[in-house]
Amino acid sequence: MLKIFEKVFGSKHDKDIKRIQPTIQRINEIQASFQSLSDEALREKGSLLRQQVRSRLLPLEQQKKELALKLENPDILPADADNINASLDALGEEYDKVTALALEESLPDVFALVKETCRRLKGHNYQVMGREMIWDMVPYDVQLIGGIVLHSGKITEMATGEGKTLVSTLPVFLNALTGRGVHVVTVNDYLAQRDKEWMNPVFAFHGLTVGVILNTMRPEERKRQYLCDVTYGTNNEFGFDYLRDNMAGTVEEMVQRDFYFAIVDEVDSVLIDEARTPLIISGPVPNADNSKFQEIKPWIEHLVRSQQQLVASCLVEAEKLLKTKPNDFQAGLALLRVKRGQPKNSRYIKMLSQQGIAKLVQSTENEYLKDNASQMHEVDDELYFAVDEKAGTIDLTDKGRAFLSKLSHQDTDLFLLPDVGTEIAAIEGSSSFSTAEKIKQKDAVYRLFADRSERLHNISQLLKAYSLFERDDEYVVQDGKVMIVDEFTGRILSGRRYSDGLHQAIEAKENVRIEGETQTMATITIQNFFRQYHKLAGMTGTAETEASEFYEIYKLDVVVIPTNKPVVRKDMDDLVYKTRREKYNAVVLKVEELQKKGQPVLVGTASVEVSETLSRMLRAKRIVHNVLNAKQNDREAEVVAEAGQRSAVTIATNMAGRGTDIKLGEGVRELGGLYILGSERHESRRIDRQLRGRAGRQGDPGESVFFVSLEDELMRLFGSERVISVMDKLGHEEGDVIEHSMITKSIERAQKKVEEQNFSIRKRLLEYDDVLNQQRDVIYTRRRNGLQKDRLRSDIFDLLEDYCDVVVKKYQKGADGMALEEQVLRELSVEFRPEKAEFNDDTVGGVADKLFNAAHDFYLRKEREVPEDIMRQIEKYAVLSVIDKKWRDHLREIDSLREGINLRAYGQKDPLLEYKQEAFRLFVELLREIELETLSLAFKLFPITPEEAHDIEVRQKKEALRTEKLVAQHEEAGSILSHESDVPSGTAAQQPIKADVKPGRNDLCPCGSGKKYKNCHGQQQP
């Protein structure tokens, strides 16, 4: 029905393109008029356009500076500050409107300017990544359309070879005229450096500065690169710099500017594939115990072996039953136990390809899944642990707990989580415990829960490592380290680690050194990082299938740009085989046939293991070929360049799909172009489309086909009953192949099912991170305020005013002046003891005022004694150090909360709602602690003597060594980056500061004289 409407009224994309056409015509007319200008006149035209945009923005920028200066006044009243902030917000909105209007009016001239510049650069020789290049690019009309779409903050889908990199220069140049900085985001450092050097001639012609952020750069160099008009870099580098800026000790250490406009290359890879895991900066946990996995590893290995033996007996039982009764329910139950016990068992996977077996397992499973899987325990109870391969979860059964208990000579209860709610209620309801004893008992319950939950978590992670993660598939082992392989690109993700102890579990399994445990110092999801940009756009060859997610999460529309020349590639239906062995044999035969013909072939694989299997089979046939996978990626550019030559055979994991064009060699067009042979379907349709897109660039011929077997991961986990039943009905023999559009569509439906599941995972992650994101905004805003303000005196006094009200109310009812005195002395080092009579209801405000005045006077005396620059350091240190420490502690608590929150579902509670409530409670507590400790430090910090400075310096050096070990990681996979010390650098060596609790008047003087403080150094205090 939708296709009929599109034929009559035109598709959304057709309408989008139609609206842009008049602007394209105008651009071409202006560009034609520019051809008569000299190079110098063309440069002057560019300068004039820049001045026109800047002249409209400068007055507003000046107003913003003047208002910001007023906020710096330490004596400003809160009401005046609120009014100025409101004016700044209104001015910001006006600034954005004026910017958008100025750029919209300049767009035709700027795009024409860039096009004419490209025309003049034709034939120009320059270096890109050490190789000689000749500029041969001038934007086509379809590329101008792509540029307009990007400028409007949308995603352009452009086919491979259509020149997306050149397209980006158009909106980048236009938006760079504002002087606010434009970020171009790529998927790796190589592409960031390459694209910067490749496109630089266009920008350099007009004096625009271009920078690039690379993994190895120091902060000073990064800052210079961010100050450029255009900055290239990876999503990880931009994200980690944002987190590090919010851990900086001084304004000078911060490297980034505001987030104005970003264009994300390969936007589906960055905003979707990478979005399932957050960016994390972590540091080592002091005194962490890394032996916990080694301790339980022998038990788990024994447990896994016992499960394998149990599964083998189930397979034998099933085979016996099936000989007499092909559809026997007990045989189906035995096979279902195999699926739940060892889903990757090769014998079981082979059995699934036999007629009727897959359907029998599916129907048996459906029977036990009825009524919310209430009967599934009957299947699992016979196993030691149950595996849900789709969900990636493992549950220890009662039988497994008893087995571990026997192995470890420990009580079975040690492998069970206590019912905290019931036990706490029992303690609360007991009359035999005093209040102090109840607190002690409850602490013991919480401790028991924490110990057992950590033990069970470690067991679960080791079981996952042995049951769900296979070497040379999900990861490889190189140089004694476990390295994750990106499922979408096939590349090794250097420096990335699986989260929640899973990586350590795999290290224990592989007998390599177990890396130290880490704790989160700062974190943000890819989604929430990119949602900070005022304007965001993206480009890719494959976005349409994910259009709904782009809009729902990022509010980004997708526009499909027509190709410059029609795509003539032939995309054939899938070829379906029963077993992997049959499929691999067919792949090798097809490759042999194509090589003899002289037609180049690219064989796409989904894992390192498959690429190596096919390579061995081709070597056995003496077929010369290249392999490109996570283990052999050092020749990537060279291998890709050769892949389109006559008779070339290239086996590649998904890594050959990004940022590379395969150009056809001489005589290859006549042979049919590049032949794409997919060895299996990926779980994402986008990855398959990327593989197909390697062929047929710029009107070149090409062919593509996928070879699929029923043993493939996708078919085994998500293949529909319809496909299975069709295969069974046809009853084809070994080696037979099925080719039908219905099968291809069924496979695509299975892929859609996986995509929807992955979308729900990403969306759920975002829902959880949105809670933390709001808290992060509050904390980072407070921290930046503390970092950027010269004086924080007024903020300290605001905190003091609130403190006085709260602390006086606390002791109002009991009129306990002594307790009030003790607390104020302990927290502020201020002596204050009101008379009992002053505590009546009418004078509570008066007591608070008197306390404020006493503390205020103390602070003023301190200001007179301490040099002003040191006082500023004290205030800044008090604010920043407390925020940093408390925020780290808060993140650790949030991590713990997040790990256990899903257990609330067993109590018929919504985990997300529970998480929001608990996280809010923790955040309120965090703010209260930050305010109190900041105030306390500001009052109690005093300069120290030179003798004491030495000890402080030693401690700071130790701290600096610790912070050097901070790791920036894209969780479950981002690169290890060294980090500058986040110890505040404002403490000069000759006069550092420390937290120093002022002695009481009757305490012994700390100088060691033996006299009371009031009779010794206390006499010198005002």
Curated annotation (Swiss-Prot):
Gene3D superfamilies documented for this protein:
Helical scaffold and wing domains of SecA, P-loop containing nucleotide triphosphate hydrolases, SecA, preprotein cross-linking domain
Which intervals of the chain are annotated as region Disordered?
A: 973-1001
**Cofactor requirements of the protein:** Zn(2+)
Quote the InterPro entries the UniProt record gives.
Helicase_ATP-bd (IPR014001), Helicase_C-like (IPR001650), P-loop_NTPase (IPR027417), SEC_C_motif (IPR004027), SecA (IPR000185), SecA_CS (IPR020937), SecA_DEAD (IPR011115), SecA_motor_DEAD (IPR014018)
Chief location of this protein within or outside the cell: membrane
Q: Keywords for this entry? A: ATP-binding, Cell inner membrane, Cell membrane, Cytoplasm, Membrane, Metal-binding, Nucleotide-binding, Protein transport, Translocase, Translocation, Transport, Zinc
Q: Which top EC class applies here?
A: translocase
- Does the record's keyword annotation contain Membrane? yes
In this chain, Zn(2+) is annotated as bound at C1005, C1007, C1016, H1017
Give the cofactor note.
May bind 1 zinc ion per subunit.
| Assigned protein family | Belongs to the SecA family.
Q: What is the stated purpose of this protein?
A: Part of the Sec protein translocase complex. Interacts with the SecYEG preprotein conducting channel. Has a central role in coupling the hydrolysis of ATP to the transfer of proteins into and across the cell membrane, serving as an ATP-driven molecular motor driving the stepwise translocation of polypeptide chains across the membrane.
Question: What do we know about how this protein assembles, alone or with others?
Answer: Monomer and homodimer. Part of the essential Sec protein translocation apparatus which comprises SecA, SecYEG and auxiliary proteins SecDF. Other proteins may also be involved.
Spell out the protein name for this chain: Protein translocase subunit SecA
Q: Which organism is it from?
A: Chlorobium phaeobacteroides (strain DSM 266 / SMG 266 / 2430)
Gene behind this chain? secA
